[in-house]
Every structure is written in C-alpha cells, then in structure tokens.
Amino acid sequence: EAVFAFAERMNEKAIEIGAVNSHFSNPDGYFSPDHYTTTSDMLKIAKEALKYDNLRETFKKRKVTYKITSGQTMTFNNSNRLLNPSNPYYFEGATGMKTGYTTESGHCVIASAKRNGVEIIAVIMGGTTSNGRWADAVALLEDAFALHELTAPTTAVPAA
C-alpha cells in the first residue's frame, strides 16, 4: 500500500514538473514493466530535487547515517565515484547525485557538479559497463563546463 501511494504521488509530481514520459511503480527504481523514464525526464526530476537543501546536502556526502523509527541507525555509502578524491573518476566540484544499475536499464548515473557558480547535471542511462558510466559522466561534465566557458557572457566594451 505504501509503495502504491508513493508511486501515485511520484507520478503526479513528475507530470507537474513536465516529466511526462515517465511512469513510476516503485520508490527504488528496480525493474517493473510499468516503471520507465527518459534521460530528459530524469534531468527535470534532478533539477527539481536540487531545489531542496536537505537532498542537495545528502547527494554530495560519501556516507550518511540515519536513525530510523525503531531507534536503530542505518549507514549508507554513496557509490558515486565522482565524489571520491582517491578514485580515478573523481571530478573536482562534483555534488552528487544518484547511481543505479539493473539488467534492463544498464549502468546509470545522474551526476551533478558545480564550478565557478555554474551547476551542470549529466544523465547517463543504459551504460554497458560501470567504468563506462563514470567515463561518460566525466566527459559530459568536462565538455559542458568547457562549452559554458566558451559561451559565457563577457563584460561589454564601449564602442570606439
């Protein structure tokens, strides 16, 4: 019942933010025939999630410990290699967000990074290898930041 209620609310929110090519049937992202999305919709959802400071802070942590209602604590390790300075895929300025893998969807990541006040989000889905997902994320982020620098507005200079 809780899973159904979550999915119903998630689908409503997705439509509200313009993620109209998705349908969610569970909160964990595992395969279900009626659970699907697109890279474009995931970008919209990621942008929405980053509006919430508590989520933004959680996404960038390498480890999070929560106290659950029973009083027990649970620790979650973030598998985002872009956040780990000792990993070859470390990305300076990485801020999160979410990794995933299923046989059906392949290796996926929503990767965010911020440099010089500019935040970029890259969405990779359907990767054939875990390392490939990280290499693609780094390449997309590097290219996006380089493109932004090339096209960033400059200070106007008076005409002679």
Residue ranges and their predicted role:
Residues 1-159:
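Penicillin-recognizing serine hydrolase domain
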